[in-house]
């Protein structure tokens, strides 16, 4: 499903203003850092907990708007901190995600989670399900503005922290990591939804992944990169994805 933006000047100006507002709100949550509490309120028994993975140069604080919305809807939520500003290897972060889920399974006594991977956090989660068998503990995976074709915006990171950060090299479109990630197959039975902002300058619109239904689970809405976690229409797509009954699952044809 793709929703194109209106071409009128007034509509375009409104989109720009909302995107700037979302960026400012995102920055306020960024400075909250990683010392934030997960919400263990669980008023909808039987629903999987939601695990949120932040993006490059992000913190757990950036996931708090989504965490609050899920908590308000009765879901137990956990924000996942994968390294200082996500500078290290994405493969190492994916391994840590698997270990984090294992610990939560033992602590909470639950078998499966719904996972939201924002931006680079989506690449981490996708690698975990494709190569580290994380799908055994993940019921559904939402990739929120994840650059699954890579992004040349990573060159900014290469120029600034490239000497100490493997991850900025791995997110480039020409990287072996991106090539392997696209070539790997999604595990059978795992439903994945890709959600993108039409005006996202950091993550240009990628191709649908093989195994993702391009009509049902490839969603494009007006907004920029920060809008993905700040704007309610994007949250509605996450909620509908996680709330859909399991018997709605259907075989998906290859998208590539």
List the predicted regions and their residue ranges.
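Flexible, membrane-associating and regulatory peripheral segments of lipid-active enzymes
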Residues: 1-52, 57-59, 63-73, 78-80, ...
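Short, proline-enriched alpha-helix->beta-strand connector loops that line the catalytic pocket
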Residues: 47-48, 186-192, 213-216
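Serine-dependent carboxylesterase/thioesterase catalytic core
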Residues: 50-56, 61, 73-186, 206
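Short glycine-rich catalytic loops that host catalytic nucleophiles or stabilize transition states
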Residues: 80-83, 218-224, 230
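Conserved strand-to-loop "acid loop" that flanks and positions the catalytic carboxylate
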Residues: 193-200, 222-223
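Conserved alpha/beta-hydrolase "acid-adjacent" motif
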Residues: 201-207
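Short loop/helix-cap segments at secondary-structure boundaries that form the rim of catalytic
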Residues: 207-213
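Post-His helix in hydrolase/transferase enzymes
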Residues: 229-242
